[in-house]
Amino acid sequence: MIERIWSGRNALYLLLLPFSLFYGLISNFTRLSYRWGWRKAWRAPVPVVVVGNLTAGGNGKTPVVIWLVQALQQRGLRVGVVSRGYGGKAEYYPLVLGPKTTTDEAGDEPVLIYQRTGATVAVAPVRAQAVKAVLRSAAVDIIITDDGLQHYALARDIEIVVIDGERRFGNGWWLPAGPMRERAARLQSVTAIVTNGGKALPGEMAMRLTPGLAVNLKTGERRPVTELDNIVAMAGIGHPPRFFNTLRQLGVTPLRQVAFADHQHYSAESLYSLTSSGQTLLMTEKDAVKASAFAADNWWYLPVDASLPTAEAEALLATITATSAG
Protein backbone atom coordinates (compact mmCIF):
# COMPACT_ATOMS: atom_id res chain seq x y z
CA MET A 1 0.00 0.00 0.00
CA ILE A 2 2.71 2.49 0.96
CA GLU A 3 4.49 1.89 -2.36
CA ARG A 4 1.29 2.75 -4.24
CA ILE A 5 0.77 5.89 -2.16
CA TRP A 6 4.34 7.05 -2.65
CA SER A 7 4.24 6.33 -6.37
CA GLY A 8 1.19 8.55 -6.83
CA ARG A 9 -0.99 5.66 -8.00
CA ASN A 10 -3.18 6.00 -4.91
CA ALA A 11 -4.98 9.24 -4.11
CA LEU A 12 -4.58 8.65 -0.36
CA TYR A 13 -1.35 10.63 -0.52
CA LEU A 14 -3.49 13.77 -0.82
CA LEU A 15 -4.76 13.21 2.72
CA LEU A 16 -1.19 13.16 4.00
CA LEU A 17 -0.04 16.34 2.29
CA PRO A 18 -0.53 18.61 5.34
CA PHE A 19 1.84 16.38 7.32
CA SER A 20 4.30 16.37 4.43
CA LEU A 21 4.32 20.14 4.24
CA PHE A 22 5.10 20.30 7.96
CA TYR A 23 7.88 17.72 7.50
CA GLY A 24 9.31 19.73 4.63
CA LEU A 25 9.21 22.92 6.67
CA ILE A 26 11.16 21.30 9.51
CA SER A 27 13.60 19.65 7.09
CA ASN A 28 14.37 22.89 5.28
CA PHE A 29 14.68 24.87 8.49
CA THR A 30 17.12 22.33 9.93
CA ARG A 31 19.36 22.40 6.86
CA LEU A 32 19.30 26.18 6.52
CA SER A 33 19.96 26.72 10.22
CA TYR A 34 23.34 25.05 9.77
CA ARG A 35 24.05 26.71 6.43
CA TRP A 36 23.35 30.18 7.81
CA GLY A 37 25.31 29.59 11.00
CA TRP A 38 22.41 29.63 13.45
CA ARG A 39 23.53 26.16 14.57
CA LYS A 40 27.08 24.89 14.50
CA ALA A 41 28.08 21.51 13.08
CA TRP A 42 30.91 19.54 14.68
CA ARG A 43 33.86 18.98 12.35
CA ALA A 44 36.06 15.91 12.75
CA PRO A 45 39.85 16.22 12.51
CA VAL A 46 39.77 13.86 9.51
CA PRO A 47 37.65 14.08 6.33
CA VAL A 48 34.09 12.77 6.52
CA VAL A 49 32.28 11.15 3.60
CA VAL A 50 28.51 10.77 3.88
CA VAL A 51 26.79 8.01 1.90
CA GLY A 52 23.06 8.63 2.14
CA ASN A 53 19.84 9.06 0.24
CA LEU A 54 16.97 11.44 -0.28
CA THR A 55 14.21 8.86 0.09
CA ALA A 56 13.03 6.40 2.70
CA GLY A 57 13.30 2.72 1.87
CA GLY A 58 16.10 0.58 0.52
CA ASN A 59 18.19 2.15 -2.22
CA GLY A 60 21.28 -0.07 -2.08
CA LYS A 61 23.25 2.27 0.17
CA THR A 62 25.01 -0.37 2.28
CA PRO A 63 26.66 -2.13 -0.71
CA VAL A 64 27.98 1.28 -1.80
CA VAL A 65 29.44 1.86 1.68
CA ILE A 66 31.13 -1.55 1.59
CA TRP A 67 32.49 -0.92 -1.91
CA LEU A 68 33.80 2.50 -0.89
CA VAL A 69 35.47 1.27 2.29
CA GLN A 70 37.17 -1.62 0.48
CA ALA A 71 38.27 0.58 -2.42
CA LEU A 72 39.84 3.13 -0.08
CA GLN A 73 41.50 0.38 1.95
CA GLN A 74 43.04 -0.95 -1.25
CA ARG A 75 44.52 2.51 -1.76
CA GLY A 76 46.21 2.33 1.61
CA LEU A 77 43.77 4.48 3.59
CA ARG A 78 42.73 3.59 7.12
CA VAL A 79 38.96 3.88 7.12
CA GLY A 80 36.51 4.25 9.98
CA VAL A 81 32.74 3.87 9.63
CA VAL A 82 29.94 5.36 11.73
CA SER A 83 26.23 4.65 11.72
CA ARG A 84 23.09 5.40 13.66
CA GLY A 85 22.70 1.66 14.24
CA TYR A 86 19.06 1.30 13.22
CA GLY A 87 17.47 -1.85 14.61
CA GLY A 88 20.01 -2.18 17.42
CA LYS A 89 19.72 -1.31 21.08
CA ALA A 90 23.04 -1.22 22.89
CA GLU A 91 23.43 -0.87 26.65
CA TYR A 92 25.52 2.23 26.06
CA TYR A 93 26.57 4.57 23.26
CA PRO A 94 28.80 5.11 21.45
CA LEU A 95 29.44 1.43 20.75
CA VAL A 96 32.55 0.30 18.87
CA LEU A 97 31.90 -3.02 17.17
CA GLY A 98 33.99 -6.10 17.89
CA PRO A 99 33.94 -9.75 16.81
CA LYS A 100 31.23 -10.60 19.35
CA THR A 101 28.97 -7.60 18.75
CA THR A 102 25.47 -8.71 17.81
CA THR A 103 22.90 -7.17 15.52
CA ASP A 104 20.64 -6.75 18.55
CA GLU A 105 23.24 -4.35 19.92
CA ALA A 106 24.50 -2.53 16.83
CA GLY A 107 21.93 -3.15 14.10
CA ASP A 108 22.26 -5.34 11.02
CA GLU A 109 23.94 -2.92 8.60
CA PRO A 110 26.86 -1.91 10.89
CA VAL A 111 27.56 -5.57 11.69
CA LEU A 112 27.49 -6.45 7.99
CA ILE A 113 29.87 -3.59 7.14
CA TYR A 114 32.21 -4.62 9.97
CA GLN A 115 32.25 -8.26 8.87
CA ARG A 116 32.78 -7.46 5.19
CA THR A 117 35.47 -4.79 5.59
CA GLY A 118 37.20 -5.25 8.94
CA ALA A 119 37.09 -1.47 9.37
CA THR A 120 36.64 0.19 12.75
CA VAL A 121 32.88 0.71 13.05
CA ALA A 122 31.02 2.64 15.74
CA VAL A 123 27.33 3.36 16.25
CA ALA A 124 25.55 6.09 18.20
CA PRO A 125 22.36 8.13 17.83
CA VAL A 126 24.57 11.22 17.70
CA ARG A 127 27.01 10.54 14.88
CA ALA A 128 29.64 12.95 16.21
CA GLN A 129 29.89 10.71 19.28
CA ALA A 130 30.40 7.70 17.02
CA VAL A 131 33.16 9.52 15.11
CA LYS A 132 34.93 10.41 18.36
CA ALA A 133 34.70 6.77 19.45
CA VAL A 134 36.32 5.63 16.19
CA LEU A 135 39.11 8.17 16.60
CA ARG A 136 39.76 6.97 20.16
CA SER A 137 39.83 3.34 19.05
CA ALA A 138 42.02 3.46 15.95
CA ALA A 139 44.21 5.65 13.80
CA VAL A 140 42.09 6.47 10.76
CA ASP A 141 42.60 8.70 7.75
CA ILE A 142 38.96 9.11 6.81
CA ILE A 143 35.45 8.49 8.17
CA ILE A 144 32.57 7.05 6.14
CA THR A 145 29.13 7.63 7.59
CA ASP A 146 26.51 5.08 6.61
CA ASP A 147 23.41 7.20 6.06
CA GLY A 148 23.17 10.57 7.77
CA LEU A 149 22.83 12.87 4.77
CA GLN A 150 20.23 14.80 6.76
CA HIS A 151 22.28 14.70 9.99
CA TYR A 152 23.69 18.19 9.56
CA ALA A 153 25.12 18.32 13.08
CA LEU A 154 28.11 16.44 11.62
CA ALA A 155 30.13 18.46 9.11
CA ARG A 156 31.10 16.58 5.96
CA ASP A 157 33.60 16.98 3.14
CA ILE A 158 32.06 14.65 0.55
CA GLU A 159 28.40 13.72 -0.01
CA ILE A 160 27.37 10.67 -2.04
CA VAL A 161 23.67 10.08 -2.67
CA VAL A 162 22.34 6.66 -3.70
CA ILE A 163 19.14 6.57 -5.77
CA ASP A 164 16.88 3.65 -6.63
CA GLY A 165 16.90 3.91 -10.42
CA GLU A 166 13.59 2.10 -10.79
CA ARG A 167 11.53 3.98 -8.21
CA ARG A 168 13.47 7.26 -8.35
CA PHE A 169 11.55 9.79 -6.19
CA GLY A 170 8.02 8.42 -6.42
CA ASN A 171 5.48 11.23 -6.34
CA GLY A 172 8.17 13.67 -5.20
CA TRP A 173 6.53 14.61 -1.92
CA TRP A 174 8.10 14.69 1.52
CA LEU A 175 7.26 12.01 4.07
CA PRO A 176 4.68 10.72 4.80
CA ALA A 177 2.72 11.53 1.60
CA GLY A 178 5.78 10.61 -0.46
CA PRO A 179 9.18 8.97 0.05
CA MET A 180 11.28 12.15 0.18
CA ARG A 181 13.42 13.15 3.15
CA GLU A 182 14.59 16.14 1.11
CA ARG A 183 13.51 17.37 -2.30
CA ALA A 184 15.34 16.28 -5.45
CA ALA A 185 16.90 19.75 -5.83
CA ARG A 186 19.26 18.74 -3.01
CA LEU A 187 21.17 16.68 -5.60
CA GLN A 188 22.59 19.89 -7.05
CA SER A 189 24.84 20.31 -4.01
CA VAL A 190 26.21 16.77 -3.55
CA THR A 191 29.54 15.40 -4.75
CA ALA A 192 28.28 12.28 -6.53
CA ILE A 193 25.00 10.56 -7.40
CA VAL A 194 24.96 6.77 -7.63
CA THR A 195 21.92 5.23 -9.33
CA ASN A 196 21.13 1.64 -8.39
CA GLY A 197 19.47 -0.12 -11.33
CA GLY A 198 17.11 1.45 -13.83
CA LYS A 199 18.48 4.12 -16.15
CA ALA A 200 21.05 6.58 -14.86
CA LEU A 201 20.47 10.15 -15.97
CA PRO A 202 23.27 12.48 -17.11
CA GLY A 203 25.56 13.26 -14.19
CA GLU A 204 24.67 10.03 -12.37
CA MET A 205 26.87 6.96 -11.90
CA ALA A 206 25.12 3.75 -12.93
CA MET A 207 25.52 1.03 -10.31
CA ARG A 208 24.65 -2.64 -10.52
CA LEU A 209 24.46 -5.11 -7.67
CA THR A 210 26.44 -8.16 -8.76
CA PRO A 211 25.47 -11.42 -7.03
CA GLY A 212 28.16 -13.82 -5.88
CA LEU A 213 27.98 -17.50 -4.99
CA ALA A 214 25.39 -18.56 -2.46
CA VAL A 215 26.91 -19.17 0.98
CA ASN A 216 25.73 -21.66 3.58
CA LEU A 217 25.20 -19.90 6.90
CA LYS A 218 26.37 -22.86 8.95
CA THR A 219 29.30 -24.30 6.99
CA GLY A 220 30.45 -21.43 4.79
CA GLU A 221 30.17 -23.66 1.71
CA ARG A 222 29.77 -21.74 -1.55
CA ARG A 223 27.94 -22.83 -4.67
CA PRO A 224 26.00 -21.30 -7.58
CA VAL A 225 22.52 -20.34 -6.44
CA THR A 226 21.05 -22.28 -9.37
CA GLU A 227 22.33 -25.50 -7.75
CA LEU A 228 20.08 -25.02 -4.71
CA ASP A 229 16.82 -26.97 -4.73
CA ASN A 230 13.29 -26.10 -3.62
CA ILE A 231 14.08 -22.56 -2.58
CA VAL A 232 12.00 -20.46 -0.23
CA ALA A 233 13.29 -16.89 -0.59
CA MET A 234 13.11 -14.36 2.23
CA ALA A 235 14.21 -10.75 2.50
CA GLY A 236 14.03 -8.27 5.36
CA ILE A 237 15.47 -5.23 3.59
CA GLY A 238 14.23 -1.80 2.61
CA HIS A 239 12.89 -3.01 -0.75
CA PRO A 240 12.45 -6.83 -0.78
CA PRO A 241 11.30 -7.00 -4.44
CA ARG A 242 14.83 -6.09 -5.50
CA PHE A 243 16.15 -9.35 -4.00
CA PHE A 244 13.37 -11.42 -5.54
CA ASN A 245 13.94 -9.79 -8.93
CA THR A 246 17.64 -10.62 -8.69
CA LEU A 247 16.78 -14.28 -8.18
CA ARG A 248 14.53 -14.28 -11.23
CA GLN A 249 17.29 -12.67 -13.30
CA LEU A 250 19.57 -15.51 -12.21
CA GLY A 251 17.03 -18.07 -13.38
CA VAL A 252 15.80 -19.01 -9.90
CA THR A 253 12.07 -19.48 -9.32
CA PRO A 254 11.39 -19.78 -5.57
CA LEU A 255 8.59 -21.94 -4.27
CA ARG A 256 7.61 -18.99 -2.09
CA GLN A 257 8.73 -15.43 -1.37
CA VAL A 258 8.55 -14.01 2.14
CA ALA A 259 9.09 -10.30 2.77
CA PHE A 260 9.90 -8.94 6.22
CA ALA A 261 10.22 -5.37 7.44
CA ASP A 262 13.62 -3.70 7.23
CA HIS A 263 15.73 -4.19 10.39
CA GLN A 264 13.23 -6.74 11.71
CA HIS A 265 14.46 -8.99 14.52
CA TYR A 266 14.25 -12.73 13.82
CA SER A 267 13.75 -15.66 16.13
CA ALA A 268 14.82 -19.21 15.37
CA GLU A 269 11.20 -20.33 15.49
CA SER A 270 9.98 -17.74 12.99
CA LEU A 271 12.59 -18.70 10.39
CA TYR A 272 12.52 -22.46 10.97
CA SER A 273 8.80 -22.38 10.20
CA LEU A 274 9.40 -21.00 6.69
CA THR A 275 10.62 -24.28 5.21
CA SER A 276 9.67 -27.93 5.38
CA SER A 277 11.70 -31.06 4.72
CA GLY A 278 13.72 -30.93 1.50
CA GLN A 279 13.43 -27.16 1.11
CA THR A 280 16.15 -24.51 1.15
CA LEU A 281 15.86 -21.12 2.83
CA LEU A 282 17.64 -18.43 0.83
CA MET A 283 18.07 -14.93 2.27
CA THR A 284 20.02 -11.72 1.80
CA GLU A 285 23.40 -11.23 3.45
CA LYS A 286 21.85 -8.55 5.64
CA ASP A 287 19.38 -11.14 6.92
CA ALA A 288 22.16 -13.66 7.40
CA VAL A 289 24.06 -11.55 9.93
CA LYS A 290 20.93 -11.63 12.12
CA ALA A 291 20.24 -15.35 11.65
CA SER A 292 23.72 -16.89 11.73
CA ALA A 293 23.65 -17.56 15.49
CA PHE A 294 20.82 -20.08 15.13
CA ALA A 295 21.19 -21.14 11.48
CA ALA A 296 20.01 -24.48 10.17
CA ASP A 297 21.88 -26.68 7.69
CA ASN A 298 19.56 -25.67 4.82
CA TRP A 299 19.98 -21.89 5.21
CA TRP A 300 21.90 -19.98 2.56
CA TYR A 301 22.43 -16.34 1.69
CA LEU A 302 23.24 -14.57 -1.56
CA PRO A 303 25.89 -11.83 -1.23
CA VAL A 304 25.94 -8.91 -3.63
CA ASP A 305 28.66 -6.41 -4.48
CA ALA A 306 28.28 -2.93 -5.90
CA SER A 307 29.71 -2.54 -9.41
CA LEU A 308 30.31 0.98 -10.75
CA PRO A 309 31.73 2.24 -14.06
CA THR A 310 35.51 2.12 -13.78
CA ALA A 311 36.36 5.61 -15.01
CA GLU A 312 33.70 7.35 -12.91
CA ALA A 313 34.52 5.26 -9.86
CA GLU A 314 38.22 6.08 -10.18
CA ALA A 315 37.44 9.78 -10.48
CA LEU A 316 35.32 9.69 -7.33
CA LEU A 317 37.96 7.75 -5.42
CA ALA A 318 40.62 10.21 -6.57
CA THR A 319 38.51 13.10 -5.25
CA ILE A 320 38.08 11.39 -1.89
CA THR A 321 41.74 10.41 -1.66
CA ALA A 322 42.80 13.98 -2.43
CA THR A 323 40.52 15.23 0.34
CA SER A 324 42.16 12.81 2.75
CA ALA A 325 45.65 13.84 1.64
CA GLY A 326 44.81 17.51 2.06
Swiss-Prot record:
GO terms of molecular function: ATP binding; tetraacyldisaccharide 4'-kinase activity
GO CC entries: plasma membrane
Protein's recorded name: Tetraacyldisaccharide 4'-kinase
Enzyme's top EC category: transferase
Signal peptide residues on this chain, from the entry's feature table: none
GO biological process: lipid A biosynthetic process; lipopolysaccharide core region biosynthetic process
Entry keyword annotation includes Lipid metabolism: yes
Pfam families, per database record: LpxK (PF02606)
Catalyzed reactions: a lipid A disaccharide + ATP = a lipid IVA + ADP + H(+)
Superkingdom of this protein's organism: Bacteria
Role noted for this protein: Transfers the gamma-phosphate of ATP to the 4'-position of a tetraacyldisaccharide 1-phosphate intermediate (termed DS-1-P) to form tetraacyldisaccharide 1,4'-bis-phosphate (lipid IVA).
Pathway terms, separated by semicolons: Glycolipid biosynthesis; lipid IV(A) biosynthesis; lipid IV(A) from (3R)-3-hydroxytetradecanoyl-[acyl-carrier-protein] and UDP-N-acetyl-alpha-D-glucosamine: step 6/6
Residues noted as binding ATP in the record, renumbered to the chain: 55-62
InterPro entries, per database record: LpxK, P-loop_NTPase
EC number: 2.7.1.130
Family named by the database record: Belongs to the LpxK family.
Entry keyword set: ATP-binding, Kinase, Lipid A biosynthesis, Lipid biosynthesis, Lipid metabolism, Nucleotide-binding, Transferase
